[in-house]
Structures are given as structure tokens and as C-alpha cells.
């Protein structure tokens, strides 16, 4: 079966976090951590 796994975390959860305000602050920290 073909499974496309681009990220180790589920993308469905990411969409929920995008609506949260904390997600915006987390995204900036992730860029510095990555």
C-alpha cells in the first residue's frame, strides 16, 4: 500500500492548533528550534 508520511505528527492535529493562538507562538519557536 502507498502511505505518504511527510511528517511524524498527524496533520489533522496541526489544523486544530492553527486555529489556536498558542499555535502562532509555537510556530515561531519551532522555526528557531529547527
Curated annotation (Swiss-Prot):
GO terms for molecular function: DNA binding. Changing residue 7 to A: In protamine-Z2. It is found in: Nucleus; Chromosome. Its main location: nucleus. Residues 1-34 are annotated as: Disordered. The keyword DNA-binding applies. Keywords: Chromosome, Developmental protein, Differentiation, DNA condensation, DNA-binding, Nucleosome core, Nucleus, Spermatogenesis. One of its GO terms (biological process) is chromosome condensation. Testis. GO terms for cellular component: nucleosome; nucleus. The sardaine Z1 sequence is shown. Protamines substitute for histones in the chromatin of sperm during the haploid phase of spermatogenesis. They compact sperm DNA into a highly condensed, stable and inactive complex. This is Protamine-Z1/Z2.
Amino acid at each position: 500500500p502507498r502511505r505518504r508520511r511527510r511528517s511524524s505528527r498527524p496533520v489533522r492535529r496541526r489544523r486544530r492548533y492553527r486555529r489556536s493562538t498558542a499555535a502562532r507562538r509555537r510556530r515561531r519557536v519551532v522555526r528557531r528550534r529547527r
